[in-house]
Design a protein with these regions (language model features):
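Single conserved hydrophobic/aromatic residue that forms the stacking wall/gate
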Residues: 1-12, 276, 284-286
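C-terminal domain-boundary segment and adjacent tail
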Residues: 106-145, 263
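Metal-dependent polysaccharide deacetylase catalytic core of the NodB/CE4 family, i.e.
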Residues: 73-93, 137-143, 150-157, 164-286
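TPR/TPR-like alpha-solenoid helical repeat scaffolds
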Residues: 50-66
């Protein structure tokens, strides 16, 4: 029994070690070398584990080779509106299709843009990495350039999405406050499902589906495969107007009559729950 307990202890220790190493490698892949090193050295007895010793040495070497990006004013910014999930419905000849063609991008186009940026050496940075407030000696506040350290040849870029409200004209053909199959082929709201940000989407048959139907979950999907496209966990910056609600939640007073008091109250509760649930773990900025 003693030997068996020791054996189980060794197995658990090895599993913990592997978990720490995987976490540290992920942090280093996103250029957060200090946190990667801290993850390794925070493991009890790391000095006696060759894999962890080597990982620490590798992270220190990568940190030493990183170069500070010289001029934050040259960092490009690319932005998108809500992405088109169903082109057949978006470009069906109605008066809205001209605007969609001019101002929107499809999911396929967005994914192609991400892949192109990645292949050209761009790395997504948080807008607060570019510059931040610094209190001056006289008590005033001044925005100063941030310190972004990347491997030679890598270039920072800021990504944002505008109007993340999923307006009625895009999703709700009968204006009853609920998305339907007569919509123009866009996601209808953001929500958390199974612990992940995802989108609700009503397809042409009227089925309510959940998945990567807009920028936020699509970007997460890409970063799952390419963690080195994100600088220290950076995501996109998203903006809302508040017109007809936010993130697809109809919380403006105009919808009290359309939805009824109970449904309207639930929509408001869902919206608050959505924003609060993810506030501590998301890098999206409003």
């Amino acid at each position: 029994d003693v030997e068996r307990s020791r054996g189980l202890g060794d197995v658990y220790k090895r599993q913990e070690q592997d978990t720490v190493l995987a976490e540290a490698k992920h942090l280093a892949a996103q250029y957060d070398y200090d946190k990667a090193i801290a993850a390794v050295t925070g493991f009890a007895g790391w000095e006696n584990v060759p894999e962890l010793q080597q990982a620490k040495a590798d992270f220190e070497a990568q940190k030493a080779q990183a170069v500070r990006y010289a001029d934050p004013t040259t960092i490009p910014h690319i932005f998108f509106h809500t992405l088109i999930a169903d082109t057949a419905r978006a470009f069906d000849g109605d008066p809205e299709q001209g605007g969609y063609n001019q101002f929107m991008a499809t999911i396929k186009e967005f994914n192609a843009v991400l892949q192109s940026l990645y292949e050209r050496g761009f790395v997504l940075v948080d807008i607060h990495d570019v510059a931040g407030p610094q209190q001056q000696a006289d008590g005033s506040t001044k925005y100063v350039a941030g310190d972004i350290y990347l491997p030679a040849g890598k270039k920072p870029i800021v990504l944002s999405q505008d109007d993340v409200c999923y307006y009625e004209y895009m999703t709700d053909s009968d204006s009853d406050g609920k998305p339907d199959k007569g919509g123009d082929g866009f996601a209808s709201r953001l929500l958390v499902k199974d612990g992940k940000l995802t989108c609700e989407y009503v397809d042409a048959d009227g089925q309510t589906l959940y998945g990567s139907y807009d920028l936020v979950p699509l970007l997460d999907d890409f970063l799952d495969q390419h963690p080195d496209f994100s600088y220290r966990g950076a995501r996109a910056t998203i903006a809302v107007t508040g017109y007809q609600g936010a993130f697809g939640y109809r919380i403006s007073n105009d919808y009290k009559e359309k939805l009824g008091d109970e449904a309207f109250a639930q929509a408001c509760t869902d919206a608050v729950s959505y924003t609060h649930l993810r506030a501590h773990e998301t890098s999206l900025h409003l």
